[in-house]
Amino acid sequence: MNAFFTPEGFYRTAGYSVKWLYGLAAVCAAVAFYLGFFVCPIDATQGNSYRIIFIHVASAWMSMLIYVVMAVFSAAALVTNNKMCSIFSAAMAPTGALMAFLALFSGSFWGRPTWGTHWVWDARLTSELFLLFLYLGFLALQSAIADHRRADKACAVIAIVGVVNVPIIYFSVKWWNTLHQGASITSKGSSIAPIMLYTLLLMVVAFWIYSFASTFVRARSMILERERRQTWVQALVKEGK
């Protein structure tokens, strides 16, 4: 486990798993798509338009989870000064931004037949949009500061301060009178049909595995860039790996 949190150890270990992770994510997503669009029954209230939730909810959950994990790694980086914690946080940001955008984009397609408009300044939608801006701000700051050490510290502040927005997104439908529907899955059970629940959870697993794979790919690329003067990286370059 300690080797996993060193640049060389992670680079070598993660390289073996990326293809398998992408493959597993593709299989899970394909099965979830089939179940969601061809097997799950038509909803009595929303008709077929509800099927977008399998993408919308999965991406929204992942956008929040990724940001929380980024904040944890950012805090760990400031406390321990571990290189890999900063790399993990930065490597997750593009996927988190993609998930936040996908949640908003797919939600607009669901909102048109349900609310009569693609967008409303609802508390949950607005806080999710703010989450996307946090991701974009993190990425912009990471690119704007040439010294990656200074960039990591500045971005860590954004990640840690911005994490307060995550519970706002989650509890917005309880704290305010919003158009967005409440949670269909709670600690007391689920209000949707079992086949819909299983399909949604499978899509979440697919997005979760994809996020792992994408983070691994970016982290390995960042390691090569930051550790390019190390002998083990130069040896890899000579070997064509």
PLM regions and their residue ranges:
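Polytopic transmembrane helical bundles with strong interfacial aromatic enrichment
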Residues: 1-241
